[in-house]
Design a protein with these regions (language model features):
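Cell-envelope/extracellular polymer assembly enzymes that use nucleotide-activated donors
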Residues: 2-4, 32, 191
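Conserved donor NDP-sugar-binding/catalytic core segment of glycosyltransferases
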Residues: 69-131
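Catalytic core of nucleotide-sugar-dependent glycosyltransferases
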Residues: 186, 208-211, 220-242
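Short, acidic, metal-binding catalytic loop of nucleotide-sugar glycosyltransferases
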Residues: 21-30
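Short aromatic/hydrophobic "clamp" motif used to bind/position activated sugar donors
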Residues: 57
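Glycine-rich, basic loop-to-helix element that forms the pyrophosphate-binding segment
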Residues: 38-52
Length: 242
């Protein structure tokens, strides 16, 4: 089973170099690597799978470092489980780098606002992996080391954007990415994963499909300051799936 790995990148050459080095060191060797520099991000992600030749397509960010058995583990899951359409895993972020992601502003804080956010937005379970909450937000548990305690395959609602693998034939059936997502295109990945799930296939998470996410403040990160686009993306996702 051939695996195509898609890296969408812009303005982060050093991060990209480290990501490619971790791909070079993979124990599984039947890899196709596609580096896509299109903009916006959703267009780059969509172009990647259309160019890919593998039965499995994976999207990783240019600022991740892959565990050496990352590819071997996810391909093994797909080969043994024909009813699985998508696979994801830990996207570990060090506590030092959590500040580089605005969605983790609540971590380590005791304010009433942080407690309210955890209760209302994260359903009171901030360390769960792969779940869409009642209001249509995503649970961030995959970013924390505590997720490594989870054994076996975990059934999930979505796949992590920087560590997402799908059967190419199902991506095609789902129509690929919705190109109407704006800016950094947040939620477009969740959207596609859920479209695949609606085709009748399982989405799973495994601790063996592990990456370290060295969250960068350059490149696409700068566009995350456009809250108008981010909110529009969230509302679009919510309207389609919640």
């Amino acid at each position: 089973m051939k695996l195509s790995v898609i890296i969408c990148t812009k303005g982060r050459p050093e991060s990209l170099k480290r990501a490619l080095q971790s791909l070079k060191q993979q124990s599984f060797k039947d890899l196709e690597i596609l580096i896509i520099k299109e903009s916006p991000l959703v267009k780059a992600r969509d172009l990647g799978w259309r160019k890919a030749k593998g039965e499995i397509v994976s999207w990783i960010d240019d600022d991740v470092i892959l565990d050496k058995d990352w590819a071997k583990s996810l391909v093994n899951i797909f080969e043994k489980n024909k009813d699985i359409g998508g696979v994801s895993g830990p996207t570990l972020v060090s506590e030092k780098l959590l500040k580089n992601r605005l969605v983790f502003w609540w971590f380590g804080k005791e304010s009433w606002w942080a407690r309210l956010w955890i209760k209302l937005v994260l359903d009171g379970k901030p360390f769960v992996v792969g779940k869409i909450t009642k209001i249509g937000w995503w649970s961030p548990g995959s970013n924390f080391k505590s997720c490594l305690k989870l054994k076996g395959l975990q059934e999930v609602d979505y796949l992590e954007a920087c560590n997402m693998s799908l059967r190419r034939e199902l991506v095609k059936k789902a129509g690929g990415f919705d190109l109407k997502y704006q800016g950094t295109s947040e939620w477009c990945e969740l959207d596609l994963a859920m479209q695949v799930k609606k085709l009748g296939y399982r989405l799973v998470w495994s601790r063996r499909v592990k990456v370290e996410h060295h969250v960068s403040r350059s490149g696409a990160f700068i566009k995350r300051r456009n809250w108008g686009e981010r909110i529009n993306n969230y509302l679009k996702f919510r309207k389609k799936h919640i």
